[in-house]
C-alpha cells in the first residue's frame, strides 16, 4: 500500500530527521536550526521524505536544500515542496529567491531559476555563509528566480 504524502512546516521535533535527509542528499546542514521554521517537509506517515527551505532576508530569500528521499523520488514531491515554498515566500513578500548549486543547475532551471552573475547578488544574500563558502568552489552556479 502506498502511503499518502502530507506537507507541513517543519517544527523543532523534526530537526533530526531534516538533518538526516539533508545529509543523505549531500546537502549542508549548517545553521538549519536558525531557519527551521521556514522549512517545509513532506511526510509519509511519521517519516520525513522531502524537505525544502528558505532563509528570509527582507524581500529576498535564499532557497535551501530541496531534496527527496531516494525511495520517494519520481512522485512529484519536489515539485509540490517547491510550489508550497513559493506560496510561503509570497506571503512573506519575498520578490526574489537566490540559490547556489554545484550539481542541480538543470533541475533549478526547470523550477524557473536562471543563472546570474554573482555580482548581481544583493548584499543580504552576500552576507550568508553559503555565499561566502561558494567562493571556495569555482564551479558553483548562482541562480535567481523572480516570484512576484
Label every model-predicted segment.
Residues 102-121, 125-129:
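Conserved active-site alpha-helix within GNAT-family acetyltransferase domains
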Residues 121-148:
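C-terminal "cap" of GNAT-fold acetyltransferases
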